[in-house]
A protein has these predicted regions:
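Solvent-exposed, flexible loop/coil segments flanking beta-strands in beta-rich domains
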Residues: 1-35, 116-123, 129-135, 146-152
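Extracellular and analogous surface-interaction loops
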Residues: 18-28, 80-88, 400-404, 452
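Surface-exposed beta-strand/loop patches in noncatalytic accessory domains
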Residues: 2-11, 35-77
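C-terminal functional module detector
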Residues: 120-124, 142-147, 332-499
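A metal-dependent hydrolase metal-coordination microenvironment
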Residues: 142-143, 148-284, 288-314, 320, ...
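Non-catalytic propeptide/linker segments at domain boundaries
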Residues: 86-156
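Beta-sandwich interaction modules
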Residues: 64-88, 98-100, 446-452
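Short beta-strand-plus-loop segments that form exposed binding edges in beta-rich domains
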Residues: 36, 94-103, 463-468
Length: 499
């Protein structure tokens, strides 16, 4: 079997181009061959559907090898594919262009390219991996959310926003796991642009399947998914902002129905900021408050200012009585040895890190702790312990304490080799400086008693900065009492922040 399918890229071409090919009953695997420069391949998403209309492969072509395999074993199947029986009949390839960027970077030129479809297999370097997650219907039937990776009760360190070659990252899953080990991560969320991992290489790091819903009006990660959502096709195929707002509303409702988590990413960052002002806050589970801090070297992006605004937004939401978990994401795309222009630090998974205190490390437990908001976001912190006591009972960040609580006892430990952490606490937005001490210049400890004002609603947040006011820690607030919401949409928050 062999056929050659023709496609074109220009600002005048259709965003979605479809071609069909026939697969005989004797076929055991399919190989797809193409040739495109990397920067052009980044503009192309490819989806393959079988004769039953099921998605069997989805990927942003990007930085990957130019050979794609789809077979019955993980060794024959490229990342983003589903290894299963190759059904005889009419298969379909969809090529979906990132038309927003095509219009931006293309003048009147046109690039023609072909995809050769054959049953003669080639070696696959970017194969699926031994841990298969998805079945033939793209449900995460083989992903065990209860599998315990570590039984111990402690703080676990991870990253909630990452990329590989499945979308526009430059590293394979195997390589990003090496970097995750280097950063001492316990968990890692795989969040690609509008495409989803179907499996992963064997690893002792807990990998969470997620997706970064990526549109021209904003980006958000989804966690705790049980299957590939149908709306991914709509997201990939549409650019109309009014229609996208409707899709975002449906995504929000779908997440609540599916008990999935929705987290807005880099809400104020440059070209990729959140633009859907009418988005209802009641559907927001998490908020990314620190996104790839190394990107601050790109001056026009104003990434540091964007992250500080996101931190202010999180505080604003807590002050208004919302329980939206602040988390961090490296958004790492680059190689280990690669730096943004002007940067002295490389973008890497785990910078920033998000910590969760858990009685054993497993996926379902992570989702539960995010819903409780018991997370702490850090930079330059190698180890961490936060012990807070309300009426003699130990509580975590994000806890709701009894109305009878008049004070909190706190003990905080931070390990940082390169930066001295200045600890502080915000009580209803009022800042108090706290003392940390160290005997060796890297292990810092402090303790004290914090009085809580007599108010109907109080929120108490511990944080840390370096002596040069660089972000080091954000512990989600502890709250007492309740307050009625005054903010209902993203636009309401922007008005309070005066942006």
């Amino acid at each position: 079997m062999e056929c050659i399918l023709d496609f074109s890229i220009s600002k005048y071409e259709k965003k979605v181009q479809t071609a069909a090919f026939e697969v005989p009953s004797s076929c055991l695997a399919i190989c797809f061959l193409y040739e495109l420069p990397e920067q052009i391949a980044l503009l192309v998403n490819m989806i393959v559907e079988d004769p039953s209309g099921r998605v069997r492969f989805q990927k942003q072509l990007g930085y990957s090898e130019k050979v794609i395999g789809l077979g019955q074993s993980y060794m024959d199947t490229t990342i983003g594919g589903i290894s299963n029986t190759i059904e005889a009949g009419t298969w379909t390839i969809k090529v979906i262009l990132a038309s927003e960027y095509v219009k931006k970077f293309f003048a009147d030129e046109k690039i023609n390219f072909t995809i050769t479809v054959t049953d003669e297999m080639r070696p696959i370097e970017e194969h699926l991996g031994e841990d298969i997650w998805a079945d033939a219907d793209f449900r995460y039937a083989m992903y065990d959310t209860e599998r315990v990776f570590n039984p111990n009760k402690r703080w676990y360190k991870g990253d909630f926003h990452t990329h590989t070659r499945l979308s526009d990252g430059k590293e394979t899953p195997e390589r990003v796991m090496e970097k995750a080990h280097f950063m001492n991560l316990d968990f890692y969320a795989a969040t690609e642009h509008n495409v989803m991992h179907t499996g992963w290489p064997k690893t002792d790091i807990l990998v969470l399947p997620g997706v970064e819903i990526t549109t021209s009006i904003g980006h958000a990660n989804l966690f705790g998914l049980k299957k590939r959502p149908d709306f991914l096709d709509e997201i990939l195929e549409n650019d109309n902002e009014e229609l996208l707002e409707d899709i975002w509303n449906r995504i929000a409702v779908w997440c609540k129905e599916q008990e999935a988590l929705l987290s807005i990413n880099h809400p104020f960052l440059y070209l990729w900021k959140w633009k859907y002002s009418g988005f209802p806050l009641e559907y927001l589970s998490c908020l990314e408050i620190v996104n790839d801090p190394t990107y601050a070297a790109v001056k026009e992006a104003k990434a540091k200012e964007a992250n500080m605004l996101a931190i202010r937004m999180a505080d604003c939401l807590w002050a208004d009585g919302y329980r939206i978990c602040a988390i961090g994401g490296s958004d790492s795309h680059n190689r280990m040895d690669e730096f943004y222009d002007g940067a002295t630090e490389n973008s890497i998974a785990g910078d920033p890190a998000t910590w969760l205190y858990m009685e054993g490390l497993y996926a379902c437990g992570i989702y539960q702790e995010l819903k409780k908001c018991s997370a702490c976001v850090t930079r330059y912190v190698e180890d961490l312990d936060i012990a807070i006591y309300a009426n003699g009972k130990k509580v975590l960040p994000g806890a709701i304490i009894p109305d009878s609580t008049t004070s909190l006892e706190w003990e905080i430990y931070i390990k940082s080799k390169d930066y001295f952490p200045k600890l502080f606490v915000l009580v209803n937005g009022q800042r108090q400086e706290l003392l940390l001490e160290s005997d060796d210049g890297q292990n810092y400890v402090g303790s004290g008693v914090l009085e809580i004002p007599k108010k109907d609603y109080c929120w108490i947040r511990f944080g840390a900065e370096s002596i040069h006011n660089e972000f080091m820690m954000y512990a989600n607030p502890i709250t007492r009492g309740k307050t009625a919401h005054k903010l209902y949409t993203f636009e309401d928050v922007k008005a309070v922040l005066e942006i």
